[in-house]
Amino acid sequence: MYPKLEDLLAFMPKEKGIRLVSLQYGVDDERLAKEHGNSIKLETIKDLDQVNDLEGVAALISSLDLVVSASTTVLHLSCALGVTTISTYYPNFRSSRGGDPLFMNCYPMLAGNEIFSSEKVAERTGKTVQNFIREEK
């Protein structure tokens, strides 16, 4: 189960200077623009083959301050690269501090006993992104 993109975008901070880069391959920029207007610009790196160029994807992820991802290759690669990562899914493992003990830079938005809700995950993700931005200033 994945949160809906429109739910995630609704809770993302709207501050100037924030760039959202899509790490999802096959994204249709024109469709996204029509569906979401100019409220938030979701950028794609058109020259990057996100299916066959894993080194390029790793380089892109390494250049980001924060990654938000469902449980996909992007999530696991981001965590392995040491990039601060918000998981919109349940943790694979969980420590008593709430994080993933294998990847201390990965923050799951759901506890193992919670029922998945796209809006709940999106709201928590937005708050976590906002906290990250505040701490980075």
Residues covered by each model-derived region:
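Donor-binding and catalytic core of enzymes assembling or modifying cell-surface/extracellular glycoconjugates
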Residues: 4-87
